[in-house]
Amino acid sequence: MAILRSLLLPLGLLLCLWLLCSPASCTNSTTNCKPFLSVTTKKSSLIHISPDIYKSNTLYTVSTQVSHGIISVVLEARDQNKSVIGSWENPSDHCEGRAEYYLKGNFSTLFKAKWMSPNSTDITTVKINIYTVNSLRNAELDSITLPEVGTVTVKHVSTKQVITTPTHKPTPAPPKPTTNPQKTTTNHSIPTTSLPKPTTSLYTSHPKLTTTHKSSANRAFLCPVREAIQILFIFLIGTLLF
């Protein structure tokens, strides 16, 4: 019996040590879920994720701006069935699929985390939830949804014709001037008083030079003849008288 007791004592100690270090008891960080005192939804989304389309077995980078007074950030990813999926890299605490990261310092900063999507083809959409928690465990929730490849609808705008409907009536444009300028109808009155036409012809108003020269020649010729006749007449009278 003494030998049996001496053998059972070490076995009991090993059993206790195994129970203490079993996976169920050594994962206190995964079972220590700290509840939120209150959860409110943020009005504006400040999340950026890359890539922005869901793919299986892909590493994503999630970043968000953390304001002053936030001490930790809790992240979770859920599929279309609201089941927690994927795994977060190097969290400070982990509980029920949530990953909590404790922040160093109490100031505004840009928070980043890595998330690995599961290797599954049954997932169509993934919703990333981000809880920013203050010292009183009051959390603000912000979310972003990743659609599956091929589910994003793109609106194509026709390049032929784009019809816009203005909210107010546009003012009518001024009429364009016609290409043919309108002729003015103002007629200048022609004076009725006409200049009298000269009645005398050029021949009448301007005597020929030949006539003038002929009369001058006759005068020059008749003057000495007349004087000679007068002298001769006086001589004859003188001879008759004396």
From Swiss-Prot:
Gene: PLET1
Cytoplasmic side: 242
Chain's role: Modulates leading keratinocyte migration and cellular adhesion to matrix proteins during a wound-healing response and promotes wound repair. May play a role during trichilemmal differentiation of the hair follicle.
Any single biological process term in GO: wound healing, spreading of epidermal cells
Residues glycosylated per entry: N28, N81, N106
Residues exposed to the Extracellular side: 27-220
PANTHER family per UniProt: PLACENTA-EXPRESSED TRANSCRIPT 1 PROTEIN (PTHR22527:SF2)
Organism for this UniProt entry: Bos taurus
Presence of the UniProt keyword Signal in the record: yes
Transmembrane segments: 221-241
Post-translational modification: N-glycosylated.
The protein's name in its UniProt record: Placenta-expressed transcript 1 protein
Membrane topology: Single-pass type I membrane protein
Disordered: annotated span: 162-209
Domain of life from the UniProt record: Eukaryota
